[in-house]
Amino acid sequence: MKRNEAHSPSRRRTRRSLATPALALLASTALPIAALAVDATISITGAWARPTLRGTRTGAAYMTLTNRGQATDRLLSLSTPIADRAELHEETMSGGVMSMKPVTDLMLRPGASVQIDPGHYHVMLIGLRSPLVAGESFSLSLTFEKAGAVVVTVPVTTMPPH
């Protein structure tokens, strides 16, 4: 090929027409590659929520959080599209009276697991937009200081998974 042929208008059009699909393909893989780069050190297992009655504006979800990383991580926030707010709460017994309070600083040491189960911690779903119905599920996002957002699908069931 002669030097002038390499820079001809038809060659430039061909290179440009091949470049557009190549760039589109590269762009379509950017999100999955970015998702793989996220530090997946927090595992969430055994998620479930109890069904609620019609008209009930609060619900609760349960699960186990495990830090598989090498550094302590901290739960910063929770969110879900099915409620106005999601908060981690702790139930405590004092003087024969059960009460609950928001937990604002849950730390997970390396290798540690935290049970979020009835009678202790629970994810309080405040301002439910519709009842939690057995057999359905919803997404819940837990954002950690180091691991970032971890999304879990929470099935609604009358009994915890085994």
Question: Residue ranges of each PLM-predicted region?
Answer:
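Compact, glycine-rich, soluble single-domain proteins
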Residues: V38-H162
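N-terminal secretory signal peptides
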Residues: M1-R13, P21-L31
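Sec/Tat signal peptide C-region and signal peptidase I cleavage site
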Residues: I33-A37
